[in-house]
UniProtKB/Swiss-Prot annotation:
It holds the Pfam family Exo_endo_phos. This is UPF0294 protein VC_2238. The lineage of its organism: Bacteria, Pseudomonadati, Pseudomonadota, Gammaproteobacteria, Vibrionales. SUPFAM superfamilies: DNase I-like (SSF56219). NCBIfam families: PRK05421.1-2, PRK05421.1-4. InterPro entries: Endo/exonu/phosph_ase_sf, Endo/exonuclease/phosphatase, UPF0294. It is found in: Cytoplasm. Belongs to the UPF0294 family. GO terms for cellular component: cytoplasm. It comes from the Bacteria. Keywords: Cytoplasm. It comes from Vibrio cholerae serotype O1 (strain ATCC 39315 / El Tor Inaba N16961). Coiled coil: none annotated. Its main location: cytoplasm.
Amino acid sequence: MKKRYWMAPLLIAAAGLAAFWSIFTIPTQPELVTIGRNQQGEPLLCYQHPQSEVLDLDGELNLLVWNIYKQNRANWSTQLTELSRDQQLLLLQEANMTPAFKEWIHQLGWDGTQARAFEAFGETAGVINLAKVMPTMACAYTQLEPWLRLPKSAIYARYRLSDGQELVVVNLHAVNFTYGTQEYQQQLIALLDELRDFTGPVIVAGDFNSWSEARMALLSTQLASVGLQEVRFSPDNRTTFINGLPLDHVFYRGLQLEKAEAPISDASDHNPLLVRFRLLN
C-alpha cells in the first residue's frame, strides 16, 4: 500500500513534466528569424545584407530598450507605438511573435531580426531588433537556463552608419535562475569576445537580470574590459530587484550620449529605457 501512495505523486509529477515539455520546441542550435513588413524568413544561424541603408538620422540615433513581458498586458501595442515613435532602433526582450505583434510590425513598417530561443503554441519567443533598415549582419546566441532548461537569447548585429562606420549592437536577455555566476559569465563572454577585435562604436543593452552584487560586479568588469561605459538615466525608473539593483542596462562606446530616461509604464513588468546618441564625427 505504501508503494501505491508514493507512486501516485510521482506519476502526477511525471505527467505534469511531460505536459510542460510538450508545449515547447527548442532549436538544437541558435536560430535567427528575419522579420519584415511583408514577410517572415526561414530560421538561420546568421543573416547578412552588406548593402543595407544607414541606421542613424543625420548623425542622431534614438534607441528604445524594453522587456515587453511577452505582450501579456492589454495596452502593450499602444505604449510600444508611442515609445517607438521617434526611435531608429528598438531592442526588445521577451518578445512573442504573436499574430497581433506581427501585425503591429507590419502596420508600422519595421524590419528586423529575432533570436528564436524557443517556440510555444506555435509562437516564436526571444529577443528582437527592429529598425527601418536591416543590419548588415546579425547572429543569434542562446544560453540554457540551468534549472528551467529553457534558453535565454541574444542578438549580435552590425548596422551601417552615415559616417561610414559600422555600429555593433548586442541585444541581451541574460540567464536568470542560476546558482552562482558561471552560466551568466559564459553568456556574457560569448558575446563580448566578438567585440575585442572591433574598434568602432558599440551598444550593449537589454535585460541583464543583474539581481545580485556578484552579477553586477561581473557585468561591470566584463563590459569595462571592452571599453564600454554605462548609461546613467534621469529620471531613473528602471525596474529593480527587491534589493534595489536595476535589471536593465545600456552600455556604449564610441558615441556621444545626449539624453537617457527610464519612464514609468504599466504595459510591462519592466519600465522602458529611452536613449539618444549622436555620432562623434
